[in-house]
C-alpha cells in the first residue's frame, strides 16, 4: 500500500502558559480511524511558543512508524515557522535574517527531525472559535499546566 493510500493520522495540538514566561502545558489528540490517544505535559518555567512547539513534537514523536499526518494547530508561530521561516533558518545555520540565534532552536530542530520521518500536512485553525478538537487540545494543555504547577509545589 502506498503512502497516498494510507489513511492519515489526525493530530490536534495546543499549548498554554500562565504568564509568558511562566508555568505552561501542552496537549495533543491523535486519531487514527477509531483509535484515539490523548497526550499532555508541561514545564514549570516556559513560554507559550515553546508549549505550542512541544505539543506538535510530542505528538509526532509518539508515532511508532512513519505516517501520513494531518496536523492542526492554532499557533501562528508554529504555522509560520514550519511553513516559511525554518527553510531560511537551516540555510543560515539556525540564525534569523538579522543573524541572531533562532529562539527555541532545540525544539525547532526536534520538529525538523520529525519532518524527515513523517509526511505532514499542516493546518491552521483559529483558536477558541468552536473547533471541538482544538478546544479539547486546549483543555489538555491547561490540564498539563495545572498538573505541572501542582508537581512543582509538592517538591
Swiss-Prot record:
Residues given in the record as Mg(2+) 1 binding sites: 14, 52, 74
Subcellular location: Cytoplasm
UniProt-listed InterPro entries: RNase_H, RNaseH-like_sf, RNaseH_domain, RNaseH_sf, RNaseHI
Cofactor, how bound (note): Binds 1 Mg(2+) ion per subunit. May bind a second metal ion at a regulatory site, or after substrate binding.
Major localisation: cytoplasm
Lineage: Bacteria, Pseudomonadati, Pseudomonadota, Alphaproteobacteria, Hyphomicrobiales
Protein name: Ribonuclease H
Sequence similarity: Belongs to the RNase H family.
UniProt source species: Rhodopseudomonas palustris (strain TIE-1)
Amino acid at each position: 500500500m502506498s503512502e497516498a493510500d494510507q489513511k492519515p493520522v489526525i493530530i490536534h495540538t495546543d499549548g498554554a502558559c500562565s504568564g509568558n514566561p511562566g508555568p505552561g502545558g501542552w496537549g495533543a489528540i491523535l486519531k487514527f480511524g477509531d483509535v484515539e490517544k490523548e497526550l499532555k505535559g508541561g514545564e514549570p518555567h516556559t513560554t507559550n511558543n515553546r508549549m505550542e512547539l512541544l505539543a506538535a513534537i510530542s505528538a509526532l514523536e509518539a508515532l511508532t512508524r512513519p505516517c501520513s499526518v494531518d496536523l492542526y494547530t492554532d499557533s501562528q508561530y508554529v504555522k509560520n515557522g514550519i511553513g516559511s521561516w525554518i527553510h531560511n533558518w537551516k540555510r543560515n545555520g539556525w540564525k534569523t535574517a538579522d543573524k541572531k540565534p533562532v529562539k527555541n532552536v532545540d525544539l525547532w530542530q526536534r520538529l525538523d527531525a520529525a519532518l524527515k520521518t513523517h509526511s505532514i500536512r499542516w493546518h491552521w485553525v483559529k483558536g477558541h472559535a468552536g473547533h471541538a478538537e482544538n478546544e479539547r487540545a486546549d483543555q489538555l494543555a491547561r490540564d498539563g499546566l495545572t498538573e505541572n504547577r501542582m508537581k512543582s509545589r509538592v517538591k
